[in-house]
Amino acid sequence: EVAGISFGGQMHGLVILDEKDQVIRPAILWNDGRTTKETDYLNQVIGKEKLSEYTANIAFAGFTAPKILWVKENEPENFAKICKIMLPKDYLAYCLTGVHCCDYSDASGMLLLDVKNKCWSEQMLEICGVSREQMPELFESYEKVGTLKPEVAKELGLPETCLVAAGAGDNAAAAVGTGTVGDGQCIVSLGTSGTIFISSENFGVDPHNALHAFAHADGHYHLMGCMLSAASCNKWWMEDILQTQDFAKEQAAIQSQGRNHVF
């Protein structure tokens, strides 16, 4: 019998709901690059030092706060309708429970969370023109958000007592799955994006580098470096440069011993 459900999913995407909890517009996802202007404004006008003070991070085009500013500037009619701001996986949790929720690891990537103190940053909310009431309730990844709504339980064939936990952003969830928890553990992940993920029991931030300082799903923190294109680069190298799709053959040809870090 299923006792609990949780979610792990892509981070940073903007899902906005109206007063009836209906989605106002299609979600703007993490890899959408339309927010260059808004990102430059945050980094250059507000300043990286201030952003780091408020959120422990600097602005990137994929983060959620620049997306909110983009909607505010380009779709004022939609911005005016916003009653709740959510992330993609958390919207699914809302559909199951009726609770507007977000875990700390995923919230860290919004550029709206005071990561050190684990609360919404009043300064960033003001900069984006939104209120605390428009933000979801915050949870640790392992905390219970609620239980299934009766109609959802019936549709899924699950008991109404089935709990729903907050879950985590995709990289934090994957890190837990690989044992990258506690202090000083590292994982390299190559998917649609590429990340280097280092778990830490201590909080540290440097506004002069491009590392993300996020809350981790284990209740501590992590540092993460990210690039938007990773595994697809391997595909490009194979198909466009080597002119082959025989990945197994190329893998077998890789030398086990190399020289000067070339294999």
Predicted segments, located by residue:
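A conserved helix-loop-beta module that forms one wall/lid of the active-site cleft
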Residues: 128-140
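Glycine-rich phosphate-binding loops at beta-strand->alpha-helix junctions
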Residues: 140-148, 168
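Active-site core segments that coordinate phosphate-bearing ligands/cofactors
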Residues: 36, 43-58, 66-101, 111-122, ...
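N-terminal glycine/serine-rich phosphate-binding loop of ATP-dependent small-molecule kinases
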Residues: 1-25, 53, 81, 137, ...
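Carbohydrate-associated surface elements
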Residues: 32
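Residue-level structural signal for beta-strand termini and adjacent loop
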Residues: 28-29, 106
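N-terminal phosphate-binding loop and adjacent alpha-helix
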Residues: 1, 29, 43
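Glycine-rich beta-strand-to-loop/alpha-helix junction loops that act as flexible
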Residues: 7-11, 141, 190-193
